[in-house]
Regions:
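Coil residues (strongly favoring Ser/Thr
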Residues: 25, 33, 64, 79, ...
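Extracytoplasmic soluble-region selector
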Residues: 80, 86, 105-116, 131-195
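N-terminal helix-cap/turn-to-beta initiation motif at the start of protein domains
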Residues: 31-46, 139, 145-147
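N-terminal targeting signals for Sec/Tat export/insertion, comprising classic cleavable signal peptides
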Residues: 9-33
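Bacterial Sec-dependent N-terminal signal peptides
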Residues: 1-7
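Beta-sheet ligand-binding and adhesion/scaffold domains
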Residues: 91-133
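Edge beta-strand at a domain terminus
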Residues: 32-35, 78-87, 118-134
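N-terminal glycine/threonine-rich, aromatic-flanked beta-hairpin/loop signature
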Residues: 50-102
C-alpha cells in the first residue's frame, strides 16, 4: 500500500493530515530559527560560457511570461524568444515562439536560491545567476579591479574581457558578466555598459 499522507498528532488532540504530494520539505528547529523566505523565480537570470561562446539571459515575470535573450558572441549574432512558463514544484515548463514555431522545454529545478537557479535540461545541467539592479560602467581601454577577494568568473571576451583579475572594456556596447562576491561566497550577474 502506498504511503501518500503525512499525519501530525498535536498535544491538544487535534490531528492534521497532509497529502505528501503537497509537501516539498520538512524542517525541524526552534520557532525563532524557522523564518523561511520563499525564493521567487520572477526576475532575470544569466548563464554564460566563454568556452561555448554564448550567454543566455532569462527574464521571468510574475504574470508567467518570460523572455530569453541568447547572445552567440563567438558567432556574431543574437536571438530573443518569448513565451510563457509554468512551475509545478520542481518542474519548470517553458513555451516559446522558438524562431516562428512552437517549442516546449521541460526543465527540472535542482536548486533555487536568492542568487542561483540550477536546472537539468535535455542538454545537461545549467546554473543561472540572478541579475543585480546595479549597472557597471567602464570606458573602452579602462579596467575595473575587483577588491576584497571578489572576482569576475564570466565575461564574453568581445565587449569586456578578464585579465589579471581585472575587467577590461574592449569595445562600446553592453554585455553581462558573472561576479563572485567573496564576503557572501555567492555569484551574481551584472550588466556592463562600455562607453
Amino acid at each position: 500500500m502506498a504511503q501518500n499522507s503525512l499525519q501530525i498528532h498535536c498535544k491538544d488532540g487535534s490531528v492534521y493530515v497532509i497529502p505528501t504530494e503537497n509537501v516539498d520539505s520538512i524542517t525541524f528547529g526552534d520557532a525563532d530559527s524557522l523564518n523561511v523566505v520563499e525564493v521567487e523565480l520572477a526576475g532575470s537570470w544569466l548563464w554564460g560560457s566563454a568556452e561555448k561562446g554564448y550567454y543566455e539571459l532569462l527574464s521571468f515575470s510574475k504574470d508567467h511570461t518570460y523572455t530569453a535573450y541568447d547572445n552567440y558572441f563567438t558567432y556574431g549574432f543574437d536571438t530573443t524568444t518569448y513565451g510563457f512558463y509554468s512551475q509545478y514544484s520542481a518542474m519548470l515548463t517553458l513555451w516559446s515562439n522558438g524562431f516562428g514555431y512552437q517549442h516546449r522545454y521541460n526543465w527540472y529545478i535542482t536548486g533555487l536560491s536568492a542568487n542561483a537557479l540550477s536546472v537539468m535540461t535535455k542538454m545537461g545541467p545549467f546554473t543561472y545567476y540572478r541579475l543585480q539592479p546595479e549597472i557597471l560602467n567602464i570606458r573602452v581601454g579602462d579596467s575595473i579591479k575587483c577588491t576584497d577577494g571578489d572576482s569576475i568568473v564570466f565575461a564574453d571576451g568581445v565587449v569586456v574581457r578578464i585579465e589579471d583579475g581585472k575587467l577590461y572594456g574592449i569595445k562600446e556596447g553592453s554585455t553581462f558578466i558573472q561576479k563572485y562576491i567573496a564576503s557572501t561566497g555567492l555569484i551574481y550577474a551584472y550588466k556592463v555598459v562600455v562607453e
